[in-house]
From Swiss-Prot:
InterPro entries found in the cross-reference section: APT_dom, APT_N_sf, CTDL_fold, Enterotoxin, ToxinB_BORPE, ToxinB_su2/3_C_BORPE
Subunit comment: Pertussis toxin contains five different chains, S1-S5. They are organized into 2 functional subunits: A, composed of S1 (which is toxic) and B, containing S2, S3, S5, and two copies of S4 (B binds to the membrane receptors). Dimers of S2-S4 and S3-S4 are held together by S5.
This protein's name: Pertussis toxin subunit 3
Pfam name, any one: APT
Source species: Bordetella pertussis (strain Tohama I / ATCC BAA-589 / NCTC 13251)
Gene: ptxC
Amino acid sequence: MLINNKKLLHHILPILVLALLGMRTAQAVAPGIVIPPKALFTQQGGAYGRCPNGTRALTVAELRGNAELQTYLRQITPGWSIYGLYDGTYLGQAYGGIIKDAPPGAGFIYRETFCITTIYKTGQPAADHYYSKVTATRLLASTNSRLCAVFVRDGQSVIGACASPYEGRYRDMYDALRRLLYMIYMSGLAVRVHVSKEEQYYDYEDATFQTYALTGISLCNPAASIC
C-alpha cells in the first residue's frame, strides 16, 4: 500500500505544481480595478442606497483597494456604526473598520450609504487621445445624465468614454455624440474613438479600464489598413 501511495504521489505532484503555477499566472495577468481617489468620497448617502445626483455607492473592491480611504474611515466613523456599500457593508470605528461582502444592494438597509462623486478633474491639459479599431459595448445611462460606453478590441476593454449634456467643455457636442454612440453600439461597427483626459469618470463600478470625456467618433474604412 505504501509503494502504491508513493507511485500515486509521484504522478500527482507534477500536476499539482503545474496547477499552482497556472493559478499564480492567472492571478498575475488579471487586470486590477481602477480605484477612485479619496477626494471623491462623500458620506452623504441616505438609507436604501440613495446617493445624491452625480454620485454612486462605493463598492467593496474600491474600498479594499484604497488604504488611505480605509484609514480615514476608521477615524471618522463613530462607535458601533454600520454603513452600506454597493455590494457589502462597512463596520465602523468600534468594530475596527471591517469591510464585509454582500450581494449588490444588500447593504442598502442601513441608515447611511458611502457614496463617491463620479467625476474627477485630472489636471491634464486638453489634448486629443484616440483608440483605433474598437467597438462599443456596455452602454450606460448614468444617474447624472451622462451617456457612457466601454470600447473593446479583440474582446479586451481598452477605454471607457462618456458624453454629458450638462457638464464639461464638450457638452455642446452631446446630441451628435449620443446619436453616434447609439448607432455604433447597435451596429457593432469598428471605430476610432477620441477622448480628452481632462476629466476622468467613475460611472462604472469596479472598472478595469480608464473612462474619460468623449470628444469624437470616426468610422473605420473596412478597405483601409489604417483606422
